[in-house]
Regions:
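C-terminal catalytic and target-recognition region of SAM-dependent MTase-like enzymes
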Residues: 70-126
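Secondary-structure boundary elements
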Residues: 3-7, 67-68, 126
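Mobile active-site "lid"/loop adjacent to the S-adenosyl-L-methionine
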Residues: 13, 30-61
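Short, glycine/acidic-enriched loop or turn micro-motifs at the edges of active sites
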Residues: 17-18, 39-40, 79
C-alpha cells in the first residue's frame, strides 16, 4: 500500500452494518465512504444480509458518518432489481440532494462489444 500512496487508508473487513452503527455511536466522521455491498450474504453467526432489505438503514448510518463538506460517497449495487434511479432516490432520502452526482450501469463488454450488465453505481461529492 505504501508504494501506491494509500498507506493512510483504513480498509474495513468486518460486518459493515455493525461497523457503521458502532462508528455512529462513537461520533466518528469520514471524508469518503465507498459502499460495495453484496446482494445477499450470511454472517458468521447466521445473520442474513439482503440488499433490498438493509440498504436504506446502511445509507442512513452513512449519512451520519460522512462529513458535511469536502466529502464523497460511492455506492455500487449488484442486484439487477435495483436501478440507478432507485439508488439515487435512496441516497437523496438519507443525505439530501447533493450538488454533484453521477449514476449509471455497471457492465462487462464482451469481445463482440456486447454490454452485459451486472449492477448500477451512484456517487456524489459535497
Amino acid at each position: 500500500m505504501e508504494s501506491s500512496g494509500l498507506d493512510g487508508v483504513r480498509w474495513i473487513v468486518e460486518d459493515a452494518m455493525k461497523f457503521v452503527e458502532r462508528e455512529v455511536r462513537r461520533g466518528n466522521k469520514y471524508n469518503a465512504i465507498i459502499l460495495d455491498p453484496p446482494a445477499y450474504g450470511r454472517g458468521a453467526n447466521g445473520e442474513k444480509w439482503v440488499l433490498e432489505e438493509h440498504i436504506c438503514r446502511m445509507l442512513e448510518c452513512c449519512a451520519e458518518l460522512l462529513e458535511r463538506k469536502n466529502a464523497f460517497l460511492v455506492l455500487n449495487l449488484y442486484s439487477m432489481g435495483l436501478s440507478s434511479m432507485l439508488a439515487r432516490t435512496a441516497v437523496h432520502q438519507a443525505f439530501g440532494v447533493p450538488k454533484f452526482e453521477q449514476m449509471g450501469e455497471l457492465y462487462f463488454e464482451d469481445r463482440s462489444k456486447k454490454q452485459i450488465p451486472f449492477g448500477t453505481y451512484y456517487r456524489f461529492k459535497r
